[in-house]
Amino acid sequence: WEKIKSLKVAYITEKLSLDSKEAQEFWPIYNEYEEKRHELMRKEHTQIKDKLENSDDLSEKEAKKLLTLKIAIEEDEEELDKAFLIEVSKVTSAKKALLLLKAEEDFKRDLIKQYRHNKGGK
């Protein structure tokens, strides 16, 4: 996991052409965002997805409660994303905030491609 994280840091730094001042301000914001994002994913997993494993036993009342929770988590994610992009654009630029979105998608795609290539080669 640490290797992937360090590859991602290098990839994003290169794609955004962050200078040392920008990087010094950007990475703490990014790391905090990633942690909050993971917290929301863990919350969704533990409070919703685990319960869906036994969906045959799920009552309509419980399902409504889980659906409400799912919507609330998605709203929290959306607010987190908006606040993050605004903050990133302040310490870098609006253009770099947009480039970040592309860089993250490209990194994921490249990582999956690499995984499939290595898996197929074994």
Predicted regions and their residues:
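Acidic, low-complexity proline/glycine-rich segments
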Residues: 1-9
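Amphipathic, charged alpha-helical segments and their helix-to-coil junctions
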Residues: 6-7, 15, 74-122
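General structural signal for secondary-structure boundaries
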Residues: 1, 59-60, 117
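Amphipathic alpha-helical segments
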Residues: 8-91
